[in-house]
Amino acid sequence: MVMTPREIVQELDKHIIGQDDAKRAVAIALRNRWRRMKIKDPVLRNEIMPKNILMIGPTGVGKTEIARRLANLAKAPFIKVEATKFTEVGYVGRDVDSIIRDLTDMAIKQEREFAMKKVEHLAEDAAEERILDVLLPPARGTLTPGEKNTTARQVFRKQLREGELNDNEIEIEVAATPVGIEIMAPPGMEEMTSQLQSMFQQVGSYRTKTRKMTVAKAMKILREEEAAKLINEEDIKLKAIESVEQNGIVFIDELDKIAKRSDTVSGGDVSREGVQRDLLPLVEGTTVSTKYGMVKSDHILFIASGAFHVAKPSDLIAELQGRLPIRVELSALSVEDFVRILTEPSASLTLQYSALMETEGLTLTFDETGIRRIAEVAWQVNERTENIGARRLYTVMERLLEVVSFEATDKAGETVHVDKAYVDKNLGQLIADEDLARYIL
């Protein structure tokens, strides 16, 4: 069962502060994938296209973080790419079709993991038998069903399952690792070189060799080997392609960097506009050739994001604007947002630093006045210099706790309490001097 929009938003709330509109848009889009698959009429189901999303907002407000967290929530093929990495066909760089190829690779890996999980108990039993054959070699080369249940074998089996034999060394025959052949791909020819690499790897994939290792390590290797024998690679390919076509999600970051500004004319803009034109068929729906077969992009959900500081969404070519119908604006962060970022997420910065210092035996605590002062400092520096959003908190926290981090080993058993006075003492001079703040914070 896929999560409801409310559950998705609640899960995102654990990691991202504010930006409710963006969370709701993403949650609805994710749920609509499931709703579409539940429609019984195949003709109608095929006609329902995903509504692609464009997230607009300054840097450091949570656009990329929403994508990261969404990847964990979406039990579907998901890939995040930077728009700046791609160039128009004919220019040096990657072409946009490689997005779908990478997404398919991701789906193959995902489906293989699912398939291996289903057969893990059978693989475990087969690996166990192979190890017991080494520990108790059969007299005539093969074991009869009766011999598999002898008392000695059962004793060893019990010890093996309880981990008593984990450190024992054994010699076992395992598949030889294919020789890794690294081929440097010329721009735009990654697909051909990856096929060459896989061809060379398959040449030596059926060889075996005897290796000496601990029982624990042998168990892990043999479990993977046995699981690989039990799964059907053709089924995995078919399921992966279907999963990409019906449930795939592509997150395109930094879209504003390939927008052509209306008031500038430069040679680089030709390639930028070319990337937008190349993205059009992909976003609207086309068929891309991959090493696993043809993949249709008609029902893949595209989520794009950009700061749009210099360029505006209207600077994108009209056809691409039309293919991103849902627009969501993310707001700049306030002092209150910074306070919440430092305290509310399940892995907040204050918790992270406290946990790091705890490994040295030093107790690091933060009170409300200290947290609010850190938030105020970060907000002030953002206002006076470049606004880099929540990323400013990393810089401020590193600077604030630099001495503590350096001397933590010598202060084991002590407690460092971060309050307003502590923040002012360690950052006061930097805050007062704007030039220093510009370069250090």
From Swiss-Prot:
InterPro entries: AAA+_ATPase, ATP-dep_Clp_protease_ClpX, ATPase_AAA_core, Clp_ATPase_C, HslU, P-loop_NTPase. The keyword Nucleotide-binding applies. Signal peptide: none annotated. GO terms for biological process: protein unfolding; proteolysis involved in protein catabolic process. Pfam families: AAA, AAA_2. ATP binds at I17, G60, V61, G62, K63, T64, E65, D253, E319, R391. One of its GO terms (molecular function) is ATP hydrolysis activity. SUPFAM superfamilies: P-loop containing nucleoside triphosphate hydrolases (SSF52540). NCBIfam families: hslU (TIGR00390), PRK05201.1 (NF003544). ATPase subunit of a proteasome-like degradation complex; this subunit has chaperone activity. The binding of ATP and its subsequent hydrolysis by HslU are essential for unfolding of protein substrates subsequently hydrolyzed by HslV. HslU recognizes the N-terminal part of its protein substrates and unfolds these before they are guided to HslV for hydrolysis. Belongs to the ClpX chaperone family. HslU subfamily. This is ATP-dependent protease ATPase subunit HslU. It comes from Legionella pneumophila subsp. pneumophila (strain Philadelphia 1 / ATCC 33152 / DSM 7513).
